[in-house]
């Protein structure tokens, strides 16, 4: 318990440092002074009636507290699993107490400030094994009421969110359960209201399952390189099942490899923060700060710590990539990251998303998004010919509806539980997931004759696409549909080539050539492997067009220096380095991590046993894995054949009506992908 | 579907980021100020049936993202708009300075005949004003725009702006300056007028199909 409280007690300090106008020790002078000063007239949008409310003097005083509480709740937002298992993480976090605060802080606070109506405390006390979680679990209810209240009061002082919440209820549907006091509670993700507020309807995973998953993930973390290179299928599967909320932040950083970027660039973020920045970008960023998830407690307060952090990382990015600057769609993405991790980590994660996962999405001209729109539309023809035909007849360009979906990775579209699951898969498998989700959504919105009946005109159709049927966005349903949809990386790449060709024919050369898109964590991992051995310039092989930008990034200090040693030691724990992240302190042998779950002696015994078992199991698993991979390949062959057949049939069906168009479009036949090496294609197919 | 109207107009709301486009739309549709809003990525829209000069008109309003780099995407929304609210923020000269570019976009991409009303939004923030009424109204005159200063917060002139635009379009239809039956006019007959007219709509409905480009 004391362990848990340790970092928790720290938190107000660290946060205060950040919140107060005087820059904290590490904080650059430029940023914080600028933010508050701007947010004051940033009452800019806070027009007269609003202005008295925000009374900025009040704000800065209270922010610290808000921040502290927020931090706790945000992570508590990770759900029941987070709280129950907080013990695991807390203990892990503990030794690193002094390390970069927020993440540790969050975890520690979890149990203490939970507002969620959830049954965590009960679960905790039932679980006799977890003594240490019992502590904060008990202290929770006691301390919570006053804290919560004053926090909420302070929020309502500072922003209009709560008041306007009442209005907003109407738009949340008539059967909304939210009313009166209930409004003031956050859901388990930290939302105070709005369309993404989750009622109590969420299915939660049984505690023991959650804990098992955590252990598995911890084991993966400790051998990450090995897992990625040799047992990626398993990693993928686990991402699809949903990353345990307590470990989500860390997993995202591992999957995106932002973790390594952070390690290789110590102090870089601070340096970027300190740089003056281009006013052209800063102005736009400031205008957007209060417009990100205004119903999330972290971002509800004007000038609160969530908004400040948002400012920091968005600004840092414009300095990191001056050629890219700031795109408004980056803000929601950054905000989602910030809900899970401290600013510096969120920044590097954002960098990975913008550079590796979705290169060009946020660049001037937005060509990449338009191109993906075309690719999407081509894929839709297979996934849902009806929807495809309908949209085509209505002349609804893909960019009319998919822009926000793709650019924000659905962060503004789906219910929150689904957002997180989608992001889990996205970090692992890359853009393919975005395509699949979008295809699923369209298929279930416009995919049948009855559904189309209510969308006679363009406007009705668009309206339908803005108000997707809730059942198709529901977490489990969506994930199931997404994982069974046969849209592979190879397919996307093939379509990419085809659409790029079309683009060149009709619109000329691309103005902006982004670097090559990497399909998820394995591709990122492989790229890194290729780059890091002293290969020298031959890495140009990877991406001809990307060379330039990569060069500029190199100037930014990103790549080379440390790796070789680490590469060699791919096996055991990247431990010490991780500690620096403040996420994962002592050597994380999977079993060591479970220590806090039980009384220590017992657990140690158990651990040893478990280690043995684990090793044996590991061997077995590897065998199985190999077998499974074989089967997987066979299945894929079979599926390819099926796909071909289906296409044939589709063509026949279409052929009757649209023989002309068919010729024009041409079958998406093998010759499209011909220029890609077929070997890589086969491998990519195996991903799916 | 049950609603009947004489005409349907497609409207755009355009202008730089943070000028209050979405808030104007929200104020017009819901009659209240939208306090906690996301910024628009891509497009939002809303519709409302209004009564203008004895005719019922359904306004179908497309609200666009303001940031410069979204323009390439938002262009696809322009097609076939009959009217537009061109919005700037009276407390930000920068947003005023980019008006010309927005106007060009609207006239080239939507239609040269598009009826545009210039809206100096955030009228309630008069003390922080950077663009004078006179200056803007001169700009409006030079470019043949109507002009109003609006406040999405208080609602002042918001409804007026939309109605004024609609009224002008109706007048142009009456005077024959605008032909609703021309493709891409942004105007459609509603059910009410369809009953009186000899089904001009069927021609329209068929039109898009042959060009399966």
Swiss-Prot record, chain B:
A lipid is attached at residues 211, 213 (S-geranylgeranyl cysteine). The modification 5-glutamyl serotonin is found at residue 67. One of its GO terms (biological process) is early endosome to Golgi transport. A motif (Switch 1) lies at residues 39-44. It is found in: Cell membrane; Early endosome membrane. A motif (Switch 2) lies at residues 65-74. The modification N-acetylalanine is found at residue 2. GDP binds at residues 18-23, 121-122, 124, 152-153. Serotonylation of Gln-67 by TGM2 during activation and aggregation of platelets leads to constitutive activation of GTPase activity. This is Ras-related protein Rab-4B. It comes from Homo sapiens (Human).
């Amino acid at each position: 318990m004391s362990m848990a409280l340790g970092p928790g007690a720290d938190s107000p300090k660290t946060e205060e440092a950040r919140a107060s106008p005087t820059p904290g020790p590490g904080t650059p002078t430029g940023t914080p002074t600028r933010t508050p000063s701007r947010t004051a007239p940033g009452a800019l949008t806070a027009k007269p009636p609003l202005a008295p409310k925000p009374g900025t003097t009040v704000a800065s005083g209270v922010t610290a507290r808000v921040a502290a509480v927020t931090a706790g709740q945000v992570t508590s937002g990770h759900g029941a699993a987070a709280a129950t298992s907080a013990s695991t993480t807390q203990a892990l976090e503990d030794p690193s107490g002094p390390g970069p605060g927020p993440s540790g802080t969050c975890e520690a606070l979890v149990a203490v400030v939970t507002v969620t109506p959830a049954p965590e405390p009960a679960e905790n006390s039932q679980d006799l094994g977890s003594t240490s979680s019992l502590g904060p679990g008990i202290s929770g209810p006691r301390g919570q009421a006053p804290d919560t209240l004053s926090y909420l009061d302070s929020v309502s002082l500072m922003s209009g969110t709560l008041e306007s919440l009442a209005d907003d209820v109407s738009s949340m549907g008539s059967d909304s359960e939210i009313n009166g006091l209930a409004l003031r509670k956050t859901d388990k993700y930290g939302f105070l209201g709005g369309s993404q507020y989750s009622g109590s309807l969420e299915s939660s995973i049984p505690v023991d399952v959650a804990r098992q998953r955590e252990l598995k993930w911890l084991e993966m973390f400790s051998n990450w390189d090995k897992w990625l290179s040799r047992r990626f299928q398993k990693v993928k599967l686990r991402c699809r099942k949903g990353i345990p909320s307590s470990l989500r932040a860390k997993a995202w950083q591992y999957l995106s490899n932002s973790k390594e970027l952070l390690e290789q660039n110590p102090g870089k973020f601070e340096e970027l923060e300190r740089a003056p920045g281009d006013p052209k970008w800063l102005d736009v960023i400031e205008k957007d700060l209060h417009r990100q998830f205004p119903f999330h407690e972290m971002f509800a307060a004007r000038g609160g710590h969530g908004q400040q952090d948002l400012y920091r990382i968005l600004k840092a990015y414009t300095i990191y990539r001056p050629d890219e600057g700031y795109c408004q769609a980056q803000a929601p993405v950054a905000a989602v990251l910030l809900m899970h991790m401290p600013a510096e980590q969120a920044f590097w994660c954002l960098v990975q998303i913008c550079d590796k996962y979705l290169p060009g999405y946020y660049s001037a001209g937005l060509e990449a998004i338009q191109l993906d729109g075309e690719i999407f539309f081509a894929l839709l023809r297979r996934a849902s010919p009806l929807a495809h035909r309908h949209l085509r007849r209505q002349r609804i360009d893909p960019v009319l509806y998919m822009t926000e979906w793709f650019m924000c990775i659905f962060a503004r579209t789906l219910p929150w539980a689904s957002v997180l699951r989608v992001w889990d898969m996205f970090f692992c498998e890359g853009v393919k997931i975005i395509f699949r989700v979008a295809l699923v959504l369209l298929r279930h919105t416009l995919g049948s004759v009855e559904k189309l009946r209510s969308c006679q005109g363009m406007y009705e159709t668009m309206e339908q696409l803005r108000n997707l049927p809730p059942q198709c966005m529901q977490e489990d349903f969506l994930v199931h549909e997404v994982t069974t949809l046969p849209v592979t990386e190879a397919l996307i790449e093939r379509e990419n080539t085809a659409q790029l060709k079309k683009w060149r024919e009709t619109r000329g050369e691309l103005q902006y050539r982004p670097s090559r898109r990497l399909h998820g964590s394995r591709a990122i991992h492989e790229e890194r492997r290729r780059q890091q051995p002293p290969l020298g310039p031959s890495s140009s092989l990877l991406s001809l067009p990307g060379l330039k930008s990569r060069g500029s990034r190199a100037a930014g200090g990103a790549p080379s220096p440390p790796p070789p040693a680490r590469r060699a030691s791919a096996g055991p724990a990247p431990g010490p380095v991780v500690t620096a992240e403040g996420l994962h302190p002592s050597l994380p042998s999977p079993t060591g991590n479970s220590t806090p779950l039980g009384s220590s002696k017992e657990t140690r015994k158990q651990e040893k046993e478990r280690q043995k078992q684990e090793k044996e199991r590991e061997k077995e698993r590897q065998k199985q894995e190999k077998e499974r991979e074989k089967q997987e390949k066979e299945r894929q062959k079979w599926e390819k054949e099926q796909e071909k057949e289906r296409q044939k049939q589709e063509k026949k069906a279409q052929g009757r009506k649209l023989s002309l168009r068919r010729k024009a479009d041409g079958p998406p036949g093998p010759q499209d992908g011909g220029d890609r090496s077929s070997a890589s294609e086969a491998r990519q197919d195996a991903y799916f | 579907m049950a609603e009947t109207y004489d005409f349907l107009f497609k409207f755009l709301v355009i202008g730089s980021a943070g000028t209050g486009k979405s808030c104007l739309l929200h104020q017009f549709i819901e009659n209240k100020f939208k306090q906690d809003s996301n910024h628009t990525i891509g497009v939002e829209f809303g519709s409302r049936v209004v009564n203008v000069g004895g005719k019922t008109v359904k306004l179908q309003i497309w609200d666009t993202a303001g940031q410069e780099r979204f323009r390439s995407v938002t262009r696809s929304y322009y097609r076939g708009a009959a009217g537009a609210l061109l919005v700037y923020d009276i407390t930000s000269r920068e947003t005023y300075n980019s008006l010309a570019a927005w106007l060009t976009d609207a006239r080239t991409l939507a239609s040269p005949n598009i009826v545009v009303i210039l809206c100096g939004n955030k009228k309630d923030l008069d003390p922080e004003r950077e663009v004078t009424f006179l200056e803007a109204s001169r700009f409006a005159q030079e470019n043949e725009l109507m002009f109003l200063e609006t406040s999405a917060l208080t609602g002042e002139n918001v409804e007026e702006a939309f109605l004024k635009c609609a009224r002008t379009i109706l007048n142009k239809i009456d005077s024959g300056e605008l032909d609703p039956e021309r493709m891409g006019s942004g105007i459609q007959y509603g059910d009410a007028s369809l009953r009186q007219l000899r089904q001009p709509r069927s021609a329209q409905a068929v039109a898009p199909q042959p060009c399966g480009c």
